[in-house]
């Protein structure tokens, strides 16, 4: 699939999202539910801000010493009997994974939820050599059989679908004949997937966090599918972004606590799995061969820059769950497998601005995302930095907008010009004004007036209003008098 999803323009995607009433209602309901659950989990933990600071320090320290911890991880995985491959690009990662599949003569591959495998387009790469890849996460499974519909949320990929739509998908693709009852739908999916686990030649997982000190990988799930993917197939492949690492189990304990509470409002998910070695003598299950693929794919270019904090992300989607923009347009509007505020920051860093220059502007800069982030990523500040890069370094600002801003800057910096401008604006704009508002504006105003009215400029300037009403006619209470003395 890759990071980019679809070929529609940003405006087309947003319009489609706004027109999808069900999606907007589903997102709104989910945001409210998750926000309340997270708040309760924070309160139960206590000292939430101190926990956030500690989590931020862990992520910052790890990234500042990433080369050391990756080397330690690699050495320990090798000591445990596994193989490690560092992939600089998505293509390199896919070539290595395909080589393993061909060597094992794999026909069927079972896979647990993984954002980085979506990012590198791994499924499509394996399908190109004749492998059948089965998604075992329920949400991802629904999307896969629905003609590879892309995910719209980092944690809940099928958030944009309702139970009736899922029933129709199961009926059309898998012969389902029962109701749209969620329990019946889940049991049906379970029956379908269980046989896939038993027949799989290779199991592939993502990695929530790798533990450098022991060479372990950890998986945090609520469905248990990842455990089956790592115990039944004889060969296991784990794919991880190079930043998804912690120094020790002690730091893991803290970050998993933050991840579960921030993602779904739970103290702990149903399954937290740590895997360290291949199957040993006497073991009844587990892989006989283990491969860890560590993916760069642009991450090293972010290290040491003003955007490095974006790599602190632990993929909890807390920022998405409070974002007012995501609430109204949904995940697909971002045109990336990484939606929401973190997607608007991360996607241009990994893919460039050519297809994603609108994303940093898909924000009200309300900072709700920054306040929600369990590792204190200053998301709204990073979005502003992106805008500055787009305007000053990339020179991508539309000419009309650039000229308008330069013109305003010139006028605003010259008191006499500003006075003339505010005095003349109502008369200049009067041909466009009707019933106290501008309904169709020219140039830079067009984007605004295409979807909302712009209040007309008043003929009485604020300075004139203040001269006649401000000084002598505004009541000053004791507080005001004290402050003015």
UniProtKB/Swiss-Prot annotation:
Signal peptide: none
UniProt binding sites for [4Fe-4S] cluster 1: 313, 316, 319, 373
GO biological process, one term: lactate metabolic process
Domain 4Fe-4S ferredoxin-type: 304-334, 353-382
Residues annotated as binding [4Fe-4S] cluster 2: 323, 366, 369
Domain of life per record: Bacteria
PANTHER family listed in its UniProt record: LACTATE UTILIZATION PROTEIN B
Name of the protein: Lactate utilization protein B
């Amino acid at each position: 699939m890759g990071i980019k999803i679809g070929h529609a323009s940003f405006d087309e995607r947003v319009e489609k999202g706004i027109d999808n009433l069900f999606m907007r209602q589903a997102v709104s309901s989910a945001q409210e539910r998750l926000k309340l659950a997270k708040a309760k989990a924070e309160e139960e933990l206590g000292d939430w801000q101190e926990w956030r600071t500690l989590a931020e320090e862990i992520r910052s320290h790890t990234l500042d010493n990433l080369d050391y911890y990756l080397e330690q991880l690699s050495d320990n995985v090798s000591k445990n009997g596994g193989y490690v491959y560092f992939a600089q690009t998505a293509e390199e990662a896919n070539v290595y994974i395909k080589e393993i599949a061909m060597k094992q003569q794999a026909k069927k591959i079972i896979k647990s939820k993984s954002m980085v495998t979506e990012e590198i387009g791994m499924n499509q790469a394996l399908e190109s050599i004749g492998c059948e890849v089965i998604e075992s996460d329920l949400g991802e499974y629904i999307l896969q059989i629905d003609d590879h519909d892309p995910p719209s949320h980092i944690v809940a990929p099928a958030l944009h679908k309702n139970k009736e739509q899922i029933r129709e998908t199961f009926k059309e693709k898998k012969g389902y004949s029962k109701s749209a009852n969620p329990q019946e739908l889940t049991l049906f999916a379970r029956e379908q997937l269980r046989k896939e686990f038993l027949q799989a030649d290779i199991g592939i997982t993502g990695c929530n966090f790798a533990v450098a000190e022991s060479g372990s990988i950890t998986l945090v799930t609520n469905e248990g599918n990842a455990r089956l993917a790592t115990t039944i197939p004889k060969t296991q492949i784990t794919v991880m972004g190079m930043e998804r690492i912690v120094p020790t189990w002690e730091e893991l304990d803290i970050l998993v606590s933050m991840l579960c509470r921030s993602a779904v409002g739970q103290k702990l998910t149903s399954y937290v799995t740590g895997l360290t070695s291949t199957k040993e003598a006497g073991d009844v299950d587990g892989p006989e061969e283990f491969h860890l693929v560590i993916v760069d794919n642009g991450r090293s270019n972010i290290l040491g820059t003003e955007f490095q904090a974006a790599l602190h992300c632990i993929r909890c989607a807390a920022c998405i769950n409070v974002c007012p923009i995501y609430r109204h347009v949904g995940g697909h509007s971002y045109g990336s497998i990484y939606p929401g505020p973190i997607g608007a920051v991360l996607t241009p860093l990994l893919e460039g601005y050519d297809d994603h220059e609108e994303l940093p502007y898909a924000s009200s800069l309300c900072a709700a995302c920054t306040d929600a982030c369990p590792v204190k990523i200053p998301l709204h500040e990073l979005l502003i930095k992106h805008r500055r890069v787009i305007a000053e370094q990339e020179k991508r600002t539309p000419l009309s907008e650039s000229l308008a801003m330069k013109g305003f800057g010139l006028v605003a910096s010259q008191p006499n010009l500003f006075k003339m401008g505010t005095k003349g604006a109502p008369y200049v704009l009067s041909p466009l004004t009707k019933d106290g508002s501008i309904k169709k504006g020219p140039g830079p105003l067009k984007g605004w007036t295409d979807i909302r009215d712009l209040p007309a400029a008043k003929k009485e300037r604020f300075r004139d209003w203040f001269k006649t009403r401000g000084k002598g006619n505004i009541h000053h209470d004791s507080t005001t008098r004290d402050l003015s003395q």
